[in-house]
From Swiss-Prot:
Gene source species: Sus scrofa (Pig)
Protein name listed in UniProt: Pregnancy-associated glycoprotein 2
Tissue specificity of this protein: Expressed throughout the chorion, with the signal localized exclusively over the trophectoderm.
One Pfam family hit: Asp
Localization in the cell: Secreted, Extracellular space
Keyword Methyltransferase found: no
Keywords from the named record: Aspartyl protease, Disulfide bond, Glycoprotein, Hydrolase, Protease, Secreted, Signal, Zymogen
Disulfide bonds: 107-112, 268-272, 341-376
EC number: 3.4.23.-
GO biological process: one example: proteolysis
Lineage: Eukaryota, Metazoa, Chordata, Craniata, Vertebrata
Domain Peptidase A1: from-to ranges: 76-417
Active site residues per record: 94, 277
PANTHER family: BETA-SITE APP-CLEAVING ENZYME, ISOFORM A-RELATED, PEPSIN A-5
Sites where a glycan is attached: 56, 79
Length: 420
């Protein structure tokens, strides 16, 4: 088997390290099973894109603010260790943020009690950086302090690595999450000031030949997914990698040419932006564009689906019981983006065109079945439109399960190829 370094396609034998990822139940699924999702969404309205675009306003004085893009659907986790001797943690390898953080033993919040926590006094290599940090999320907050220690990711070792330790975590999303913390893989420009990102530290310490990493997200229920550092393994994709230049070096953001269905443009008609994000499960887009997609789904499968923006105009349905009226409003009887499961076979591909290359997403991918109630849901979700009206999409795991993705920080580009 030949390992390839992205920049020069030079054969490697020792430089590529692969970390297995496990697909676990998302926070959204956990909340839905417990009947908590509806109230949670009411209590925590979230503007994903506005948080993404406000990154530069987050670093104020000695605090660092970093938004988490999708607070319910982080489902692929891997293991790392911190300290000497190593303390183990399960983290999300997240291309939408740049910092590493885990809970600390000083955190007594409910979210921390249910997760593993780092004990600085048990590590001979720990150093307190003497800086407070505060991470703001759509679903809550994490506050703590900055430390540094030895971080091990598989066979890779990052010494003197800066990371956050939480002292307080609020929000049900943290309480119900399977993961302990987050390992950010975005650019240094959105990291805590004065710190070096994990990927840059690995390169600086010659642990990897190039600042390159790649994701293969398996469609299997649990095992088979990997994140690889320093190169790629060709067995995880078919054909050649198609390279896409970044439009900015903060998040992994690229230009999206258009979105089509059976040759008809249904989104991004004049070109727009897309963020490729392993920390997001769904396909997120502007509300009008997503409504158009769901209208098309309704047209093709002919029944049951109602555009969400129609709920405001629909009347109450009234049940009269023992001469007493019990109205049920449309907000209750129209669930969000429910699709008959048998419609998946009839629905067409939705095609994302990136850098003049078509990337089809079939209905089997964008219509997901919930194992608990056998209902199917569209994985297209709308986000609040931003003040500047820029059309931005988030290509999450629905897209990344179909396409093997390489993140090349050295040349500021993303490589895409059909996953095996």
């Amino acid at each position: 088997m030949k390992w390839l370094v992205i920049l020069g396609l030079v054969a490697l034998s020792d430089c590529l390290v692969m970390i297995p990822l496990t697909k676990v139940k998302s926070v959204r699924e956990s909340l839905r099973e417990k009947g908590l999702l509806k109230n949670f969404l009411k209590e925590h309205p979230y503007n994903m894109i506005q948080n993404l675009l406000s990154k530069n306003s987050s670093h104020v004085q000695k605090f660092s603010y970093q938004p988490l893009r999708n607070y319910l659907d982080m489902v692929y986790v891997g293991n790392i260790s911190i300290g000497t001797p190593p303390q183990q943690f399960s983290v999300v390898f997240d291309t939408g943020s740049s910092d590493l953080w885990v809970p600390s033993i000083y955190c007594k919040s409910k979210a921390c009690v249910t997760h593993r926590s780092f004990n600085p006094s048990h590590s001979s290599t720990f150093h307190d950086r003497g800086k407070s940090i505060k991470l703001e999320y759509g679903s809550g907050k994490m506050s703590g302090f900055l430390g540094q220690d030895t971080v091990r990711i598989g066979q890779l070792t990052s010494t003197g690595q800066a990371f956050g330790l939480s002292k307080e975590e609020t929000g049900k999303a943290f309480e119900h999450a399977i993961f302990d913390g987050i390992l950010g893989l975005a650019y240094p420009s959105i990291a805590i000031k004065g710190t070096t990102t994990v990927i840059d530290n690995l390169k600086k310490q010659d642990q990897i030949s190039e600042p390159v990493f790649a994701f293969y997200l398996s469609s299997d229920k649990e095992e088979g997914s990997v994140v690889m550092f320093g190169g790629v393994d060709k067995k995880y994709y078919k054909g050649d990698l198609k390279w896409v230049p970044l439009t900015q070096t903060s998040y992994w953001q690229i230009a999206l040419d258009r979105i089509t269905c059976r040759g008809r443009v249904i989104g991004c008609p004049r070109g727009c932006q897309a963020i490729v994000d392993t920390g997001t499960s769904m396909l997120h887009g502007p509300s009008k564009a997503v409504a158009k997609i769901h209208s098309l789904i309704k047209h093709f499968e002919k029944e049951y689906v109602v555009p969400c923006n129609a709920r405001k105009a629909l009347p109450d349905i009234v049940f009269t019981i023992n001469n007493v009226d019990y109205p049920v409003p449309a907000q209750a009887y129209i669930r969000k983006y429910v699709v008959p499961c048998n419609a998946r076979k009839a629905l067409p591909d939705i095609v994302f065109t990136i850098n003049n290359v078509d990337y089809p997403v079939p209905a089997q991918a964008y219509i997901r079945k919930n194992a608990n109630n056998n209902r199917c849901y569209s994985t297209f979700e709308d986000i609040m439109d931003t003040l500047n009206q820029r059309e931005i999409w988030i290509l999450g795991d629905v897209f990344l399960r179909l396409y093997f993705t390489v993140y090349d920080e050295g040349q500021n580009r993303i490589g895409l190829a059909q996953a095996t």
